[in-house]
């Protein structure tokens, strides 16, 4: 997923895509084997990483954990960047998996977390990653997905672009569960932000499958020629032990999106 642009230049798209998927699978496997209970939620003290503290326009605090690239800037003119949600829980596993594979050491991982002492800050992620909720059901507070996207687009991305030379054709978003749902929402509503979205066990069932409305609008815009989906991709992963309906939801979404491959979207 990180190497689609480079893959086309090398005329080896299948090989490069498999390599990219292998890197991400290695990171996910490391995460699952370690378990959330052992995930690092402390201050980042990992070799080859740094940490930033940032605020959104509304004053919400974020802890940004960055896995630094190794070596010279790639021949593409910039480093591939992966934005990783739920950074407190997942950053150490992804950072270790990246450094263990030589071909991906030039990537930058930007993990978005919170200044809390727990791997998963359920109240913050419930707000940041979700659609608006009815007032009587809005506990914990939800509905901050567009504000969170604003923070990423208007504050975090400019800082990353200032700190590193970024290959703008190699910007990815990775999220799990609610994070996967959020990643798909980002693709449907702001397809220009990320070239690649990886949604691991996405919560497609949430709010009576609220994403269907955004999917229909996205598909309509694509067929009308309003979107440039060249080199855009959506990769959805589910485990074979998940609920059958959750697996089926992912398969059906993939089938529906196949009609957009004519416009460049890979799913």
What is each stretch, according to the model?
Residues 37-41:
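Sec/Tat signal peptide C-region and signal peptidase I cleavage site
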Residues 10-11:
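Intrinsic-disorder-associated, low-complexity terminal segments enriched in Asp/Asn/His/Tyr and depleted
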Residues 26-35:
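Bacterial N-terminal signal peptides
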Residues 42-267:
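Non-catalytic cap/lid and distal C-terminal segments of serine-dependent acyl enzymes
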């Amino acid at each position: 997923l990180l190497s689609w642009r480079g893959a086309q230049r090398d005329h080896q798209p299948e090989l490069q895509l498999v390599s990219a998927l292998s890197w991400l699978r290695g990171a996910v496997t490391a995460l699952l084997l370690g378990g959330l209970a052992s995930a690092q939620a402390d201050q980042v003290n990992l070799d080859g990483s740094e940490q930033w503290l940032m605020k959104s326009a509304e004053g919400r605090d974020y802890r940004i954990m960055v896995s630094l690239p190794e070596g010279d800037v790639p021949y593409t003119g910039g480093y591939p960047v992966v934005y990783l949600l739920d950074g407190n829980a997942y950053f150490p596993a992804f950072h270790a998996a990246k450094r263990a594979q030589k071909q991906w050491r030039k990537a930058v991982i930007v993990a978005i977390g919170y200044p809390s002492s727990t791997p998963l800050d359920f109240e913050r992620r419930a707000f940041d990653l979700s659609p608006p909720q009815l007032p009587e059901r809005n506990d914990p507070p939800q509905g901050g997905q567009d504000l969170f996207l604003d923070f990423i687009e208007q504050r975090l991305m400019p800082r990353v672009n200032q700190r590193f030379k970024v290959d703008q054709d190699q910007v990815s978003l990775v999220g799990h569960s609610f994070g996967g749902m959020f990643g798909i929402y980002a693709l449907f509503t702001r397809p220009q932000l990320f070239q690649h979205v990886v949604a691991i066990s996405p919560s497609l069932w949430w709010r009576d499958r609220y994403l269907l409305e955004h999917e229909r609008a996205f598909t309509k815009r694509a067929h009308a020629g309003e979107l440039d989906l060249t080199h855009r991709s959506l990769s959805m992963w589910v485990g074979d032990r998940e609920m059958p309906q959750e697996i089926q939801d992912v398969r059906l979404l993939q089938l529906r999106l196949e009609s957009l491959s004519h416009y460049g979207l890979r799913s």
